[in-house]
């Protein structure tokens, strides 16, 4: 494809060279550049692509995209300046891979909590309906039975290059639908620009990622961007910012909720240790459904999934038959079966709100104690640590504060931040920095009717310590300890 074709939808200045050259690939990593590639210089948190332009040229880049002045000389390489390299990357990748999102029923799910669960519920129901569906999110990307098994990705919403590659791969393998998590970071960094979403979904909003966004207002506004990129938005009307999304979004809206007069509602919930059943109501039709996943948030996640399928044109009565196909999601309310019949749940909850909801649900499941093992990630929103400590301290009978992914912080410093929240409500807790030892301690003090909640990492099979990923899997540790 000609560089001129790839640049057709953005404003640019040709600094030098020829835009009628053939482009055979795109990269924003200078080390991955090959002959006749275009290298897009992106400024990240730790590295600036403009510092690697010479390396990209030496590796064969036919063209380089920049968004700031570049004064060094590079021979035989076209140089193009744009306003924003991240926007340019999304534009170029969309065209280079022939606008893959337009060939799919693409559903984007945003919100603080529930994104991973909702995309898998939507996938489970669409697959049961006979529609091959790919997923992209925290657990990786996957297209079941189509030679694309779970492939890990980082971050949750891939960079525009990888995203368009994955979508094109889905299409080549026969997918008709794709469901993806759309993070606030991805929206802010233009990773999903030029994506053609059929449906956008909003789950909820609570404090998270303030290290990146600065304020909850900025965080919220990034989420709202999705509803200017799709024809219809499926939103949780019970959430505090639902009205603002409707006011600021430019799409049509379909609402769901329990507490409000939404388009799709639920009532008469019956919560059991391993399931929830409830009546679902839509346009005068009511039906009882049961899902083999417990908790109030399961009701909301199921409603979000049902609403998404309705907006994709599937009729309500057909959808009701698909609800039973919903399966538990890895690391989300995951019960660890064990020979000693200990009540142990592993969950990804890592915000004050998600921990609160998890522990409220756990209280409904037991007459015994709730013992919670948890920590907070390093190099992330420090302001939520005390709030998480307070939530766990109030709703647990005993807490063990430990390490999560400390990254470049000292685990002891993170634990102290959590501890300050616990001290405000005089909770019972102890501190064990080593996560394996903390889990071991939790199991040791667990009595017959107690529940042990191991929170924060869920599906993750690693700890990030400094710049290194060290293998660590909560479920493996539990199984080893219980032997």
Swiss-Prot record:
Binding-site residues, UDP-N-acetyl-alpha-D-muramoyl-L-alanyl-D-glutamate: 30, 156-157, 183, 191
Motif Meso-diaminopimelate recognition motif: chain residues: 404-407
A matching Pfam family: Mur_ligase
SUPFAM superfamilies documented for this protein: MurD-like peptide ligases, catalytic domain, MurD-like peptide ligases, peptide-binding domain, MurE/MurF N-terminal domain
Binding site for meso-2,6-diaminopimelate: 380, 404-407, 456, 460
Known EC number: 6.3.2.13
Record GO cellular component, one term: cytoplasm
Family: Belongs to the MurCDEF family. MurE subfamily.
Name of this chain's protein: UDP-N-acetylmuramoyl-L-alanyl-D-glutamate--2,6-diaminopimelate ligase 2
Taxonomic path: Bacteria, Bacillati, Bacillota, Clostridia, Eubacteriales
